[in-house]
């Protein structure tokens, strides 16, 4: 955290709260005047955030792409983004992220979102799946993979 915290009185963002490990470390480094806003879509993250009872901490259950709605320009001292699936999400078979355990093909970060990976595979066209793999996964073999799925 030494590299991230340049101003102990500053405003920091943890854009991928997960289970709160990074947020807790940031808060340990901040003065009481310093502030931390953490974002995550996951219901389990919301539950974990409830255990942090500090006045200078705020959890927002949304995608970090919504930062502009919560933070003024040029007011930030630092941002942490740890992208990807968290270990707890991989450890929970019902979340459908791991290929090492049996579970539903879910893969939703936001469990309230209705569309699952299974829905996409069963209902989307080869072209739509290819576009998803190309656009969001930057997969060079998106057409080939989509063809094998459909």
Where are these regions (language model features)?
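S-adenosyl-L-methionine-dependent methyltransferase catalytic core, i.e., the SAM/SAH-binding region
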Residues: 1-150
């Amino acid at each position: 955290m030494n590299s991230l915290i340049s101003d102990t009185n500053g405003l920091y963002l943890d854009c991928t709260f997960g289970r709160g490990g990074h947020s807790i470390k940031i808060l340990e480094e901040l003065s009481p005047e310093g502030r931390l806003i953490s974002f995550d879509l996951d219901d389990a993250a919301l539950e974990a955030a409830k255990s942090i009872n500090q006045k200078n901490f705020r959890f927002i259950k949304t995608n970090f792409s919504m930062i502009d709605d919560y933070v003024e320009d040029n007011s930030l001292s630092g941002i942490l983004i740890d992208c990807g699936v968290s270990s707890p999400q991989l450890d929970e078979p019902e979340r459908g992220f791991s290929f090492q355990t049996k579970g539903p093909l879910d893969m939703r970060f936001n469990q309230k979102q209705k569309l699952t990976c299974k829905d996409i595979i069963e209902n989307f066209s080869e072209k739509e799946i290819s576009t998803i793999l190309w656009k969001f996964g930057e997969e060079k073999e998106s057409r080939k993979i989509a063809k094998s799925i459909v």
